[in-house]
């Protein structure tokens, strides 16, 4: 989650959700009576309805929320309500409209009575779920930064100080510089618990850094991308590119793989500290025992309305006890395994004997 602005006087928070997890998180904080402003498409009829033409017109609307629906299958949040602000020439004010919010779509959320600090903290916690590290480097400068939902923080920067192209020591100095930059980047990635590292720059130095990084860090995706320069300017250029959003979404898949691997490890060695199937995980959530929860997106759209309601209550229970909640697509290899385990799995804070429901 990228948090762009918090205005407590106006009761406004401006955010950009970046993953399905972020979309679900928004569904838990947006409530009836809130005001939500976002870009949208509205079908406008010209001439007499039925005989005239109609077009879907892009516009920015503010709605007073009446209903919020999280659609995990489409990774969208549907926000339905009465339009209270919009272009006058289209006559949309006072009519119903549904905003469709997906990853990458900026929105303003206004709570007329003010944002409770607990909800702001909830958004901030969510914005720290996934971290990426960017190293932007060329033959002159480098910078290393951590990228989270709250923004970009430069943690290291400097010059390569290479001798001239005709200097016989240039290649050795370049190798030394690459080693230092790669080690610095690896240290940042480990310290920030990053799931991916992007090596960016205009030339070949970024490739050398990426190659060195692959030998220094494990379990971290290394991505290489082209930007026009190294240093801090290169970092911010990289962050503005859409590839970062896709990388963060890919990182969420890596996180799901990590949870499944830990689940399988505990299944063999600590079976009391896992739960699977909706019933088991729900019971664990009631006890406050869920540490991390991984749920299949299609589980939220079960054909049985009672099951859907049970899933919704499970998510709210888990959230209330500060469990980390993750979603995974049924079309992914991880999703295929989670489906075979009942559509939802959990890592537990302590062991539970589900036969007798006693802690251990």
UniProtKB/Swiss-Prot annotation:
Its EC number is 3.1.-.-. Its cofactor is a divalent metal cation. Gene3D superfamilies: 3.30.1330.30, eRF1 domain 2, Pelota, domain A. GO terms for cellular component: cytoplasm. GO terms for biological process: nonfunctional rRNA decay; nuclear-transcribed mRNA catabolic process, no-go decay; nuclear-transcribed mRNA catabolic process, non-stop decay; ribosome disassembly; RNA surveillance. It is an enzyme of class 3 (hydrolase). PANTHER family: PELOTA, PROTEIN PELOTA HOMOLOG. The gene is pelA. It holds the Pfam family eRF1_3. It comes from Hyperthermus butylicus (strain DSM 5456 / JCM 9403 / PLM1-5). Its main location: cytoplasm. The N-terminal domain has the RNA-binding Sm fold. It harbors the endoribonuclease activity. Keywords: Cytoplasm, Endonuclease, Hydrolase, Metal-binding, Nuclease. May function in recognizing stalled ribosomes, interact with stem-loop structures in stalled mRNA molecules, and effect endonucleolytic cleavage of the mRNA. May play a role in the release non-functional ribosomes and degradation of damaged mRNAs. Has endoribonuclease activity. This is Protein pelota homolog. Belongs to the eukaryotic release factor 1 family. Pelota subfamily. It is found in: Cytoplasm. Monomer. GO terms for molecular function: endonuclease activity; metal ion binding.
